[in-house]
UniProtKB/Swiss-Prot annotation:
The gene is Papst2. The keyword Magnesium does not apply. Its main location: Golgi. Mediates the transport of adenosine 3'-phospho 5'-phosphosulfate (PAPS), from cytosol into Golgi. PAPS is a universal sulfuryl donor for sulfation events that take place in the Golgi. Essential for viability. Involved in glycosaminoglycan synthesis and the subsequent signaling. May be involved in hh and dpp signaling by controlling the sulfation of heparan sulfate (HS). One of its GO terms (cellular component) is Golgi apparatus. It is a multi-pass membrane protein. This is Adenosine 3'-phospho 5'-phosphosulfate transporter 2. Residues 1-10 have a biased composition (Polar residues). It is found in: Golgi apparatus membrane. Residues 1-33 are annotated as: Disordered. Keywords: Developmental protein, Golgi apparatus, Membrane, Transmembrane, Transmembrane helix, Transport. It comes from Aedes aegypti (Yellowfever mosquito).
Amino acid sequence: MSVSNRNGNGSEVIYVGDRSTNRPPRNAPSPDEDRKEVKILFFDLTYYNTTTKFLLCCAGVFVLYLLYGYMQELIFTLDGFKPYGWFLTLVQFAYYTVFGYVERSLESKRVPRCIPMKTYVLLAFLTLGTMGLSNSSLGYLNYPTQVIFKCCKLVPVLIGSILIQGKKHGPLDFLAAIAMCLGLTLFTLADSQVSPNFNPFGVLLISLALLCDAAIGNVQEKAMREHKAPNNEVVIYSYGIGFVYLSVIMLLTGNLFSGITFCMKYPVETFGYAFLFSLSGYLGIQIVLTLVRTCGAPLAATVTTARKAVTIALSFVFFSKPFTINYLWSGLIVVLGIYLNVYSKRSKLTFADLNRTAERIYRKLVPQRGGSSSTKKLLLEV
């Protein structure tokens, strides 16, 4: 259908179909106004497309967290430092709180706190559990074993997204989780056979850290989505409250002053390395929080998991430790799980699709009772 009008200049304007569908409505928001602001520190990624944002965040995660992993393992090579994993966590929390406060102070636009304090009380507790237990586990485990456990973070994240956010996942997600669990089990068995530092208590510590980590990702995603909180706010309150928690605990247990005494003997190897360790970790957290905000917790976990696989390889290069070929095979199974998880984001495969496919295969393999109609006709003709 076409309708023609003449304007004041005498020229004819033709609208094809309904006029309302061809002319933009008045006061319609421009595409730029609909965009949600995405910033990492002072870098504005709002006007980049989704793929570019994802690739930039991935590059940042790999560079910063590879440095983070290297500095973390380097600190624990200092003789006598292994019992002070919780003190390292305290120093790390202090640095993170200062970094977050400085970043927030330099912002031109001050924004009041968005997320309720009771949510931050929970986040601080989970953050303390994640980082404290993870740092402490290095006193009992080989570094690659600790990292391979972290690679399987997707498993508790998957469970947490179902329980906390009520999300539904397809069969590929669960298959990825199974592959990761299998690879993790084989890697742990291999490490227990060749590593002189293997201790089952370390497995317990890192497992508890993963449970806290899974809850953090989902609670953060839900809170940031509902309250539109900036990254630095989440960091300041999560780590600031966590610092208070840990300070009180270490003061009551008497470990605070012993940690200070030891670190003052080696200030460069402890406080100095911890500064680089914390700075790279802080910047990495900003990028991971942006990934959580834009892509969701499971995909963010997949990116950080892939980075950890590279960290394991570099750990064997920079730090001497026993190696067995079983590390490689079990690690490849974990990588397969990572790939399946990434592929599941593109695939629309559901359990209903699998059920229909299984039914079709069953019909082809198992003949129907009484035979088909064509078979009956052939028998009658004979």
